[in-house]
Amino acid sequence: MSENPATPSVLVISAHAADFVWRAGGAAALSAQRGSAVHVVCLSFGERGESQGLWKQEGMTLERVKQTRREQASAAAEVLGASIEFLDLGDYPLRVDDAAQDRIVSIMRERRPDVLLTHVANDPYNRDHNLAHETTLLTRMVAQAHGHDRSTTPLGAAQVLQFEPHQPEVCGFAPDLLLDISPVFDLKVKAMRAMSGAQGHLVQYYTDLGVRRGVQAVRNGAPKTVTHAEAYQRTFPTVGEELR
């Protein structure tokens, strides 16, 4: 956990190599600019199911797609100010075995995040996202267990924020946080463009979504200077000393 409450450390668990950019790029950039440590774990490259643009290129191979996705996601993370690693677990379907779970637990204990960002629990369009959500909760639980690996320190009560899915209306997504990302939206756009070779059609979609969520943030009490926002749903209660 961060020693400074003003700069909570952030760990992002992303099912595919681009998910963190579209859905949490603003949060990552904002946190990094404020001095927080931000680390991204990509469970897969999204090489089979989320690299449409690359597969349209003549002579493309699976290994070339994976390498390209690694390069693109690494470039995007650099723009956002985050570090990144890839577990290469495959996609469509994603499979997380015991060794991968142990690795994620180790990352959590090493990184000691105050906040975890990941997918929603139920995305009927993409079951890889569901597994990423369940894996995040499972490994968080294990990382908190005092009897697990006594050579490392147990994780504290890190909040899990679920970022907005592509089809929120059918995923049961009920946001309770609209995060103002206006100061870093240009960085999010730059990071999204780094991924555009595989999924270029999503750049405009998530640009428009940022504007819509910004309008909703103002409607819900944010200053009128807010132009862009990202939506999140908390998994656990927040703790406070006042009603607000």
Name these PLM-found stretches.
Residues 1-13, 34, 83, 93-244:
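Metal-dependent de-N-acetylase/amidase catalytic core
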Residues 1-111, 241-242:
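Active-site rim/loop-helix segments in enzyme catalytic domains that contact anionic ligands
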